[in-house]
Each structure stands twice: as structure tokens, then as C-alpha cells.
């Protein structure tokens, strides 16, 4: 089972995608593996976990700590730090903007902290105008990018040498 739309806003598409979870044959499962950060909806994730537990099915939760589950969390910080260092130290870019995910989202905040730290270590300036929030998704990241472009064209903000994005969806947008 997989989702391809954001679950944090209810739409006809998200309702349709959520319906796939109603046909999970819990009585036939040896375990349920949930990609918590992909679903990004606590109500949906918690409902899946509750139904699995009701049917005595163990749950493996990836990237979202959930009580009563086998939780697997990855260390994305080190690999993201390598990306930021590569752009700054290998390519010599010192005017770098950052496209973060959601505000107050653990993944986004960790990556933003890493960006700020590595920029500072390399003597690079970080201003709030160099940071935008693209919500890990195409439409918000496109809107943030268009705002930056308008500022650059108007001469109210400097054009960066590089833009680092917190995830691949925002980078390819």
C-alpha cells in the first residue's frame, strides 16, 4: 500500500487514496510496516497501528516514533551534512539558499540546523531571506521559488550561487 498525495489536507484524491487502507487483510499479515513520514498524518498512522494491534499484528514504524511499535529511525543528518559541505567546500559556493520542508517538522528542522551550522563553519552568511519553506512538496516549493525569483529580478535580494533543498521532490520542482 502506498500514497502519492499529501495526507495533511483532505481532498477527493486523498480520500480515495486513504480508502486503500480499508482493505488491508490484517488477519493475513505477519507484520505491518508503516512509513510514518510518508503518510504525514498522525490520525491515519495511529489508526493503522490500532487496527494492527487489535489483530495482534506487530507494527514496524519507520521515521516516526510510535509507542507500542518497533521503531526504526535513520540518521539523515550526517548524509545531509555531506551534501551541504560538498556544495560549499568542493564547489566553492558561499551564497547558498535553503529550501526547507515544513516549519517545526523534525526532518526539516534538522536539515535547516545542519545548513546553518555548516554555512557558519565555512564563514558564510545566513539570513532569513535565504531560507524558504516548500513543505516537501511541489506546489509550495514552486511558490517559494517563484517568490525568490521575483525578489532577484527586482533586485531586492541577491541571487544565490546554489540552492540546497531538504528533499528530492522540492529539488526536482
Where are the regions a protein language model picked out?
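Bacterial carbohydrate/catabolite-sensing allosteric modules
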Residues: 1-12, 18-31, 38-173
Amino acid at each position: 500500500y502506498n500514497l502519492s498525495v499529501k495526507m495533511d489536507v483532505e481532498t477527493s484524491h486523498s480520500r480515495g487514496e486513504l480508502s486503500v487502507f480499508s482493505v488491508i487483510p490484517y488477519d493475513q499479515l505477519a507484520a505491518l510496516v508503516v512509513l510514518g513520514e510518508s503518510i504525514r498524518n498522525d490520525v491515519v498512522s495511529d489508526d493503522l497501528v490500532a487496527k494492527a494491534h487489535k489483530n495482534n499484528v506487530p507494527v514496524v514504524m519507520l521515521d516516526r516514533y510510535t509507542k507500542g511499535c518497533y521503531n526504526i529511525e535513520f540518521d539523515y543528518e550526517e548524509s545531509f551534512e555531506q551534501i551541504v559541505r560538498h556544495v560549499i567546500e568542493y564547489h566553492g559556493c558561499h551564497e547558498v539558499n535553503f529550501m526547507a520542508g515544513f516549519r517545526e517538522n523534525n526532518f526539516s528542522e534538522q536539515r535547516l540546523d545542519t545548513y546553518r551550522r555548516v554555512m557558519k563553519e565555512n564563514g558564510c552568511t545566513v539570513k532569513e531571506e535565504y531560507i524558504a519553506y516548500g513543505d516537501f512538496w511541489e506546489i509550495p516549493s514552486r511558490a517559494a521559488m517563484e517568490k525568490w525569483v521575483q525578489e532577484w529580478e527586482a533586485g531586492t535580494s541577491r541571487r544565490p550561487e546554489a540552492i540546497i533543498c531538504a528533499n528530492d521532490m522540492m529539488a526536482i520542482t
